[in-house]
A protein has these predicted regions:
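Extended cationic-aromatic binding surfaces that line active-site or macromolecule-binding grooves
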Residues: 62-75, 107-108, 112-115, 130-137
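Gly/Ser/Thr-rich beta-alpha loop segments that engage phosphate groups in nucleotides
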Residues: 72, 99-100, 184
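Active-site loop/lid in soluble adenylation, ligation, and acyl-transfer enzymes
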Residues: 10-78, 82, 86, 90-94, ...
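A glycine-rich, hydrophobic loop/mini-helix early in the fold
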Residues: 78-120
């Protein structure tokens, strides 16, 4: 047990030899704004589901920094938009569930596959657990203390906040008993999209500055996040470059899930579809529907 969470050795969870070999597409789309990043993820999901594209592992980053909220959250109720403007942050509503994340100084991954693909088959928690194996396997090449934790409920009596990294999830990726990767998943029309944020460096409590909170609650949540979340630089003892982390995760997914990857890019169909979705992710009808 680490902290208040049970942990399992990743090597005991699932034998990758049980999965038939497969080849997926690997895409690094670099840096984009929040609306573009969410549009790309949704379009890849559509393209893979329609068999226009193969299952895809994608890496990306965000500029300007962006607060994303889960599908069921309310931007206006959870996020102080004036505080965001003062700091140069944007905001976007994700197609996936979960809670708010400030995307800054991070690597984001996304996995898209048909629901029948063995690596995402089963219910959401089963597939989340399986995909976490790839994250853990890759991050362990950077530091051996990264583990996959059993699901544990939040401490009794403490109200859950709007922040993703404050809320324990099933089989989360942790180091030193603190959450290292925050992931969320959605299933639609036979496809699965899971994406997640890995803070590479910096203060993991910065999100607190832009949430709608009374000042005493803001200070309390900041303390909780610093206790419950961690950035990769604190784990490894150095700032690991984006490309090095992406390479480690690619190898981890390959080893843990018996995958090979073919380096690719967005197809012409996907690029055109992203342009068509931009008005949705930048518009009030989607962003402020809750």
């Amino acid at each position: 047990m680490i902290g208040n969470r049970k942990v399992k050795d990743v090597n005991t969870v699932e034998d990758p030899s049980n999965l038939s070999p497969a080849t997926w597409r690997l895409i690094d789309t670099g840096v984009s704004d929040g609306a573009t990043n969410m549009a790309i993820d949704e379009v890849i999901m559509q393209s893979v589901t329609e068999e226009r594209s193969p299952p895809t592992l994608r890496f990306y980053a965000w500029d300007p920094p962006c607060v994303s909220v889960g599908y069921s959250q309310s931007v206006r109720k959870e996020v102080d938009l004036e505080r965001c403007r003062e700091r140069g942050y944007t905001w976007v509503r994700r197609p996936t569930g979960g809670r708010a994340i400030l995307h800054i100084d991070e690597l984001t991954y996304s996995v898209v596959a048909p629901q029948g693909e063995a690596r995402v088959a089963g219910d959401i928690i089963t597939s989340y657990r399986r995909l976490s194996l790839g994250l853990v396997e890759g991050l362990r090449t950077l530091h051996g203390g990264v583990v996959q934790a059993d699901h544990m409920e939040a401490d009794g009596g403490l109200e859950k906040s709007a922040a993703c990294f404050d809320v324990p999830s099933h089989y989360e990726v942790t180091a030193y008993g603190r959450k290292l990767v925050g992931s969320a998943q959605v299933r639609r029309k036979g496809g699965v999209l899971q994406h997640g944020a890995l803070p590479l460096e910096g203060d993991v409590s910065r999100l607190v500055d832009v949430l709608v909170l009374p000042e005493p609650d803001r200070a309390a949540l900041r303390g909780k996040l610093l206790e419950r979340a961690i950035a990769l630089d604190e784990v490894v003892g150095r700032v690991v470059p984006f490309d090095e982390v992406a390479e480690a995760l690619t190898q981890g997914f390959g080893s843990a899930l018996n995958l090979e990857f073919t380096l690719g890019e967005l197809s012409p169909f996907e690029r055109d579809a992203v342009e068509g979705l931009m008005s949705r992710y930048t518009g009030d009808e989607w962003t402020h529907v809750k």
